[in-house]
């Protein structure tokens, strides 16, 4: 264990994260850096793992131009000196395994740019986001969901969407917040004769300005649905009523949240320098 004194003068013991090594292999780093891994979300972000027999969370983020990246949160009083990540120079990926951390923990990345400026950023690959905590990322539990939509999935294989009529019920974020019982809501939609629902702003968006087109999290469903599992329950309930679900989200515009993708590592890493 290591004993660390934070910026508030409080001392806390941690299991040494640097004694456990890292989880990504050299081949994975090579594929990620080359853009050849089409399921990068399974490696980037925060994932519960067992490393060296110890359960914890693996963090990985691409920030090739950053001087330093640290994992910060309430667990270390948002002090970037406590959990700096290991940088792999060949790939530009920062990685850290934090022992004993659990799903549900809110976190961000503190990124030190060349020149010394510091920004605190949301994880680009987080699968859960909490807009109420300044768009903090949340470690999502890797627990398989018990889907009950086998009949709907089988029917979809033979469905001709070009010939079958469609009646789509568009659901606003305000409506989503009011859904407490997905099964009851799905039954109501089915009774009205709709074949599909369309979820506005399915991906996490900039709710500060209520701009549904400013995507703030490309891998995290909007927290208006509750947790990702709450959204899965809604989709599951709709499919059981033979209702399709259309997810409406903007892939082309990320907005300008200070904690977002713009100027992520002190350069135009994710956006064009022309904007």
Locate the predicted segments by residue:
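Short proline/glycine-enriched turn/loop motifs at strand-loop junctions of beta-rich domains
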Residues: 62-69, 78
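Short beta-strand elements bearing conserved aromatic residues within extracellular beta-rich modules
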Residues: 69-71, 107
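Glycine-rich, histidine-containing beta strand-loop boundary motifs that form or position
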Residues: 4, 73, 82, 98, ...
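The feature marks proteins involved in alpha-glucan
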Residues: 1-58, 88-170
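Substrate-binding/active-site clefts of carbohydrate-active enzymes
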Residues: 130, 144-146, 150-275
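Surface-exposed loop/edge segments in extracytoplasmic proteins
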Residues: 77-84, 117-120
């Amino acid at each position: 264990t290591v004993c660390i004194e934070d910026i508030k003068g409080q001392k806390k013991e941690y299991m040494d994260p640097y004694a456990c090594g890292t989880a990504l292999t050299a081949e994975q780093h090579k594929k990620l850096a080359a853009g050849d891994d089409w399921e990068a979300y399974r490696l980037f972000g925060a994932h519960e793992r067992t490393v060296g027999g110890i359960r914890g969370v693996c963090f990985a983020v691409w920030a090739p131009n950053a001087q330093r990246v640290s994992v910060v949160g309430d667990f270390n009083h948002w002090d970037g000196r406590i959990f700096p990540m290991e940088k792999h120079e060949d790939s530009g990926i920062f990685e850290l395994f934090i022992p004993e951390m659990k799903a549900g923990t809110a976190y961000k990345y503190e990124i030190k740019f060349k020149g010394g400026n510091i920004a605190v950023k949301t994880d680009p690959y987080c699968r859960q986001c909490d807009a109420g905590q300044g768009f903090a990322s949340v470690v999502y539990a890797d627990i398989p969901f018990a889907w009950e939509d086998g009949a709907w999935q089988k029917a979809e294989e033979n469905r001709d969407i070009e010939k079958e009529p469609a009646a789509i019920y568009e659901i606003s974020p305000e409506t989503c917040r009011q859904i407490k019982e997905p099964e009851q809501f799905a039954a109501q939609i089915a009774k009205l004769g709709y074949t599909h629902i369309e979820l506005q702003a399915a991906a996490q968006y900039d709710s500060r300005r209520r701009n549904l087109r400013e995507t703030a999290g490309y891998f995290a469903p909007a927290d208006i649905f509750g947790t990702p599992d709450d959204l899965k329950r809604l989709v599951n309930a709709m499919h059981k009523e033979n209702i399709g679900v259309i997810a409406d989200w903007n892939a082309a515009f990320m907005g300008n949240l200070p904690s977002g993708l713009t100027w992520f590592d002190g350069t135009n890493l994710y956006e064009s320098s022309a904007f």
